[in-house]
A protein has these predicted regions:
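Short, solvent-exposed loop/hinge segments that bridge or flank secondary-structure elements
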Residues: 4-29, 36-48, 52-71, 93-95
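Edge beta-strand at a domain terminus
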Residues: 100, 109-122
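Short acidic/polar mixed-charge low-complexity motifs
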Residues: 13-15, 26, 86-88, 112-114
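Short polar/acidic secondary-structure junctions
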Residues: 10-12, 84, 95-97, 108-110
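A short, polar/proline- and glycine-enriched secondary-structure boundary/capping micro-motif
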Residues: 39-45, 87-90, 114-119
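Short, hydrophobic/aromatic-rich segments at coil-to-beta transitions
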Residues: 1-6, 72-79, 101-104
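Short, solvent-exposed aromatic-acidic interface loops
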Residues: 33-38, 82-86, 108-112
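Short, conserved turn/kink motifs that form compact alpha/beta structural patches or helix kinks used as
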Residues: 71, 80-84, 88-90, 94-96
Length: 122
């Protein structure tokens, strides 16, 4: 899943941001490179927990996806994803689909969660 991905809001179905996923020593992480909504360009993670070093930091440039490891043919799991809008962190699972053109990002707590489809941007 290394590369740039356009995140698609699972409710509005509109492009939300671009997240770049990188791999280092077998661990994958993702940083926000771009936010599409002009009104949110200067967004900060105001809702992040007080003990999270990302609290109050700009969302653009922020690492929101951490700790993913390859867990099978096209599955990456074991990491977490931060939703900067609400400051909550979820268990993350990524499945590469459609020959690498898209990925399914599943964020969950226990068995409750939601899935977004991200589209390759590069």
């Amino acid at each position: 899943p290394v590369g740039a991905w356009t995140t698609i809001d699972d409710e509005s179905k509109k492009p939300k941001s671009v997240v770049r996923i990188v791999e280092r020593n077998g661990v994958y992480s993702g940083m926000v490179e771009k936010i599409f909504d002009p009104a949110k360009q200067d967004s900060k993670c105001d809702e992040c927990a007080s003990d999270d070093p990302r609290k109050g930091q700009p969302v653009i440039g922020m690492t929101i996806l951490t700790g993913l490891k390859h867990n099978g043919e096209s599955v990456y799991a074991g990491g977490s994803i931060l939703d900067p809008a609400n400051g909550k962190t979820y268990n993350a699972k990524v499945t590469v689909i459609e020959g690498g053109k898209k990925l399914e990002m599943r964020g969950s707590v226990l068995f409750i969660g939601r899935t977004q489809t991200w589209v390759r941007a590069d």
